[in-house]
Design a protein with these regions (language model features):
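Structural detector of well-ordered beta-strand residues that form the stable sheet scaffold
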Residues: 100-101, 121, 144-145, 244-246, ...
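Acidic, low-complexity intrinsically disordered segments
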Residues: 1-210, 387
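Short, solvent-exposed turn/loop segments enriched in Gly/Ser/Thr/Pro and often Arg
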Residues: 220-225, 248, 315-319, 343-352
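Catalytic cores of alpha/beta
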Residues: 110-115, 258, 319-334
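Radical SAM [4Fe-4S] cluster-binding motif and immediate context
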Residues: 154-312, 327-330
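Glycine-enriched alpha-helix->loop->beta-strand junction motifs that scaffold or abut catalytic
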Residues: 117, 263-269, 335-338
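Radical SAM enzyme core and accessory elements
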Residues: 2-5, 13-18, 50-56, 135, ...
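Conserved beta-strand->loop/alpha-helix structural units within folded catalytic cores of enzymes
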Residues: 307-312, 317, 331-340
Length: 434
């Protein structure tokens, strides 16, 4: 069979569109900056027998060439990309392709997705993808493919590279998160709340297979089991690669051994969900792992070990008033967050947050294209939708003034070339719309 994987592009009104892989800085130093987008497709490609051909494309409807004929088209769908994905799927089906949709949105709303697909994947797909290929060969495909058990972490294969001139790649050493925050679409997917670890030997084998010098751990959090993470980092130290990773601020800040091992292994940046500067907001969201009182202390400790921080902040929790924007800006400046990223709280289908707001009659629209973390799609409790949106835009505008960008970049020079370069990219690609 001739197979095509499609990654639909979406646009966020808070962020100016920017093609990182075509930027000057990534042309100059492609081996220093880890960029990649899809984790699912390289894994599914590796699970596809060699007798099938596999192509990959990313873009919106206008950027895809529908003149090429494919037997099977797989599209990964987020809530924000749902309509664009459905449009792409419908066009491929008109051309006679068998289309499958998977991802977080189809997993939450499989019946909706089925209207635009021949088959829908619910949840993890490592076990069900091979089954689909067999079913197509026997001409007995199912309408829905859903795993009956969680994927064994060690059954995840070494990825197959689908992108030419890829400057970096992503992988997972662990899968799942037991915390189940109210707003999180990941931990509320079937089996994704179960924390699983790949054998360290498997992870090292995969890293050796990829010749690039930069990569990113896209684990839900690589600090859930810090003992495992320490052993993993020790094992990859001699590979001489640099990487970024998701982690929890409270775990990182109080474990100097982990920080030292991470730095020595090549970690240049931690991506951290601070989420809010309001204790009440964190508690209401179920974010039990964050302690605001130690933010500054822990950020300073991470910096002492030469690693930068990309900080994620969410606005719109029920206890948020208009004061939260100024307080967050003060915290970012005071703690010296290297690349702060603002998001508007978004109740994605399938999450407890969506179910609660829906039951309270506070969902304002079900236009999924607006569910991109940059629009207000629900009625906030302590401010108007307009106040939430406008203040989020203004906060982003303040955070990314040229003077603030330059100050953060200069401050990062002490961390070395790789870290300061990555900070530069993050500070100049996240520009507010003019």
């Amino acid at each position: 069979m001739k197979i095509l994987f499609v990654w639909p592009k979406i646009h966020n009104p808070i962020y100016k569109e920017f093609d990182m892989e075509k930027s000057l800085i990534c042309r100059v130093a492609p081996k220093l900056v880890p960029f990649s987008k899809s984790l699912t497709f390289p894994i599914l490609a590796a699970l596809t027998p060699d007798k099938h051909s596999v192509d990959y494309v990313e873009g919106d409807f206008s950027q895809i060439d529908f003149s090429n004929k494919y037997d099977l088209v797989g599209i990964t769908v987020t809530t924000a990309s749902a309509y664009e994905s459905y449009k792409i799927a419908d066009e491929f089906r008109k051309n006679g392709s068998f289309v499958v949709l998977g991802g977080y949105h189809p997993s939450a709303l499989p019946q909706e997705a089925k209207q635009h697909a021949d088959a829908v994947f619910i949840g993890e797909s490592e076990d069900t993808w091979p089954q689909l290929l067999e079913d197509l060969e026997t001409k007995k495909p199912r309408e829905y493919y859903e795993p009956t058990h969680p994927v064994n972490a060690d059954s995840i294969p070494i990825q197959r590279n689908l992108q030419k001139n890829q400057s970096g790649f992503v992988l997972q050493a662990t899968r799942g998160c037991p915390n189940k925050c109210e707003f999180c679409s990941i931990s509320n997917m079937k089996f994704r709340y179960l924390f699983r670890k790949r054998s360290i030997e498997k992870v090292v084998e995969e890293l050796r297979a990829h010749k690039g010098k930069s990569f990113a751990f896209y684990d839900d959090s690589l600090t859930i089991d810090s003992n495992y993470t320490k052993e993993l980092f020790k094992a990859i130290k001699d590979l001489n690669k640099n990487f970024i990773s998701y982690g929890n601020i409270n775990v990182l800040g109080k474990d100097e051994e982990l920080l030292k091992i991470a730095r020595d292994a090549g970690c240049i940046t931690w991506m951290i969900g601070f989420e809010s500067v309001s204790p009440k907001s964190l508690k209401s969201a179920g974010k039990k792992t964050n302690n605001i009182e130690v933010y500054e202390k822990h950020v300073k400790k991470i910096h002492e070990y030469g690693m930068s921080i990309i900080g994620f902040f969410v606005f719109g929790f029920d206890y948020d008033t208009v004061d939260v924007f100024g307080k967050t800006t003060e915290m970012i400046d005071h703690c010296e967050i290297d690349a702060p990223l603002p998001f508007i709280l978004t109740p994605l289908p399938g999450t407890p947050l969506y179910n609660r707001l829906n039951s309270e009659g506070r969902i304002l629209t079900r236009d999924w294209s607006k569910y991109n973390l940059g629009n207000v799609v629900f009625q906030p409790k302590m401010m108007t939708p307009e106040e939430l949106f406008n203040n989020a835009i203004e906060a982003h505008r303040e955070w990314y003034k040229i003077s603030n960008n330059v100050r953060r970049i200069l401050r990062n020079l002490k961390f070395g070339v790789r870290t300061s370069l990555y900070t530069t990219v993050n500070n100049f690609f996240t520009k507010y719309p003019r």
